[in-house]
UniProtKB/Swiss-Prot annotation:
One of its GO terms (biological process) is nucleotide-excision repair. Interacts with UvrB in an incision complex. PROSITE patterns: GIY_YIG, UVR, UVRC. This is UvrABC system protein C. One of its GO terms (cellular component) is excinuclease repair complex. Residues 203-238 form the UVR domain. SUPFAM superfamilies: C-terminal UvrC-binding domain of UvrB (SSF46600), GIY-YIG endonuclease (SSF82771), RuvA domain 2-like (SSF47781). It is found in: Cytoplasm. The gene is uvrC. It comes from Campylobacter jejuni subsp. jejuni serotype O:2 (strain ATCC 700819 / NCTC 11168). Residues 15-100 form the GIY-YIG domain.
């Protein structure tokens, strides 16, 4: 592909809305953007005389991107709103080099009350509840379950979904047994209203709990008093302390961004009934300063926080500053939630002060992050191995088996200087050789890029062959992920693993590297590899134990070791053998053996 091809592609652009994609010489996706008019927007990136080159009027970030571009593709859409949604989806799934990806695939819990019930109770959800009389509170970015427990600790409301007679909560004075009509609905709803008021005003809940703790202590019920004390400490930790009075009892959201020293900080306040009930902050290291794009980040931040399957309680979203696609986002959210949603930039008054406060806190979070975390090693890796991404989000892969038995793979995740164990994954594998096993693991991970965004770096436990395999999978996925592999030095074509003499080599797409055993970069990569190895070995051992147990069960049925090996070779694991169709088993090992398996 050449610049001449690119010039011809520019001539084919239509005068319609859509999404465009830029690719480099290797076919890697560089950037995804949306346009009201594809022809005008894309051509604005270029100057055409004396020959095709980057338009010098654009930012350094855009000029650098265009210098790398040799190919473009586009998708026409029916509207600019459709284009924006598609653009956001591509960024999340494909992780283009010059787009910023906000890594937050979490959904946060809401507390809700279903007023269709005769005696409503507090419940937790992460999605819309399809009922007509639902009242939501939140989202709560931390401590939703603990907050709910505190409410139930003080207010004697129904806790069980269904109860036909007084339960343990009634016996310990934590419920008034509405199931047995020991309280009227009117009186019950009065208590519920008090609890809702406390939910929206944590200071009220704190005062009530402090009174309860004092009474319990005076009655020498120290164990229960200690529980209440712990609840008080938790709520104080959750409470958002903002000394700004909001005159109206209204609901709205606030978003602010801050950028400093190659770190992006985002902050969200949730205001309900005139009170800031929760706040969420996120830190995202940016590859370099020229990739800061305020409009792109606001779009991504707001669309990801208000997806179609979660509640949007407020009708107004306030942002710290203006951004290009604000009005378009209003249109998308209004259509998505079937009500008028406004995104505003307040100029004066309490809303302006809250937006300023959000921005100041976003800046403070950057300073706090930089004091707590040292990104030196990531910067050294990026520079030394000529990586495209700053490797803050790393996935490390390893496989484990014993002579083709209990074949498993493992992935561990290292994110912003700590292990993210919630993202660890285990794989049961069909193949028996290392190459095909790694292909299976990496392919399965790549197929999930639409659900769990790709990392900055893949680290493979293996040599150049597995590095090339990983490259093949990444290229076919169209995502922007760097790749490194780490392997033992080979002597006489065998990996040298003698204790004290095992030397590691690092493989990258730029070549092979032998680093000193005292090199911090090597030690860091070894630490990552060792954790993946530990996790894979542990999973292998547990799998082997289970397979040995199941193997003994098959042996007890009178099946020979030859039959069992044949079954395992075909089905891969014992679970699949037991689930296999009788007809397939019969064809493989005969009717008699098949009957024994299915009958037991």
């Amino acid at each position: 592909m050449t610049k001449e091809n690119l010039e011809n592609e520019l001539k084919t652009l239509p005068n319609s809305t859509g999404v465009y994609q830029y690719f480099n010489q290797e076919g890697k996706l560089l950037y995804v953007g949306k346009a009201k008019n594809l022809k005008n927007r894309v051509r604005s990136y270029f100057a055409f005389t004396p020959n095709l080159h980057a338009n010098p009027r654009n930012s350094l970030r855009i000029q650098k991107m265009i210098e790398e571009t040799v190919h473009l593709e586009f998708i026409a859409t029916n509207s600019e709103a459709d284009a924006l949604i598609l653009e956001n989806s591509f960024i999340k799934q494909l992780h283009p080099k010059y787009n910023i990806l906000l890594r937050d695939d979490k959904t946060y819990p809401y507390i809700y009350v279903d007023f269709e019930e005769e005696f409503p109770r507090f419940e937790i959800t992460r999605k819309l509840v399809k009922k007509s009389k639902i009242k939501y509170f939140g989202p709560f970015f931390k401590g939703a379950r603990e907050l709910l427990d505190a409410l139930y600790l003080y207010y004697p409301l129904k806790q069980k979904a269904s109860c036909k007679s007084p339960c343990i909560f009634y016996q310990i004075s934590r419920c008034l047994a509405p199931c047995d009509k020991l309280i009227s609905r009117e009186k019950y709803l009065e208590i519920l209203d008090e609890a809702i008021h406390a939910l929206l005003n944590p200071s009220v809940l704190l005062k009530n709990l402090e009174k309860q703790m004092l009474v319990l202590a005076q009655n020498e019920n120290y164990e229960e008093a200690a529980k209440v004390r712990d609840q008080i400490a938790m709520i104080k930790d959750l409470e958002v302390k903002v000394e700004i009075d909001i005159a109206k009892l209204e609901d709205f959201e606030v978003f602010a961004l801050a950028f400093k020293n190659s770190v992006l900080s985002t902050l969200r306040f949730v205001v309900q009934n005139g009170k800031i009930i929760s706040a969420n902050s996120k830190i995202t290291p940016i590859k370099n300063d020229i990739q800061w794009d305020q409009n792109e980040i606001y779009k991504q931040l707001i669309l990801e926080n208000f997806s179609m399957d979660i509640p949007l309680l407020a009708n107004v979203i306030y942002v710290y500053e203006e951004f290009e696609d604000r009005v378009l986002l209003e249109e998308i959210l209004s259509q998505r939630f079937d009500k008028k949603i406004s995104i505003k930039i307040p100029k004066i008054g309490e809303k302006r002060r809250i937006c300023d406060l959000a921005f100041q806190n976003a800046l403070l979070n950057i300073e706090k992050e930089q004091k707590n975390h040292d990104f030196t090693i990531q910067k050294e890796l990026k520079s030394y191995f000529e990586l495209e991404n700053l490797p803050n989000d790393i996935e490390i892969f390893d496989n484990s088996h014993l002579q083709g038995v209990a074949n498993v793979g493992a992935m561990v995740t290292y994110r912003i200087n700590s292990w993210d164990k919630s993202k660890y994954r285990k794989f049961h594998l069909k193949h028996k050789n290392d190459y095909d096993q790694m292909r299976e693991v990496l392919t399965r991970r790549a197929l999930d890029f639409d659900k769990i965004p790709p990392p900055d770096l893949w680290l493979i436990d293996g040599g150049k062959a597995l590095l090339d395999l990983a490259k093949e999978i990444i290229v076919s996925s169209g995502v922007n992920v760097d790749i490194l592999a780490i392997s033992k030095e080979k002597i006489d074509a065998k990996a040298h693993r003698a204790k004290g003499g095992a030397k590691d080599k690092i493989h990258s797409l730029k070549g092979e590297f032998s680093l000193s055993i005292n090199d911090k970069k090597l030690q860091f990569l070894q630490k990552l590899r060792d954790e993946a190895h530990r996790f894979a070995i542990s999973f292998h051992q547990n799998t082997k134990k289970k397979q040995d147990l199941k193997s003994s069960k098959l042996a007890n049925l009178g099946l020979s070791s030859g039959v069992m090996q044949k079954l395992l070779a075909y089905y891969g694991n014992f679970e699949s053998i037991y689930k296999a169709d009788f007809k397939d088993l019969t064809m493989l090992v005969g009717r008699k053996a098949a009957q024994k398996i299915k009958e037991n």
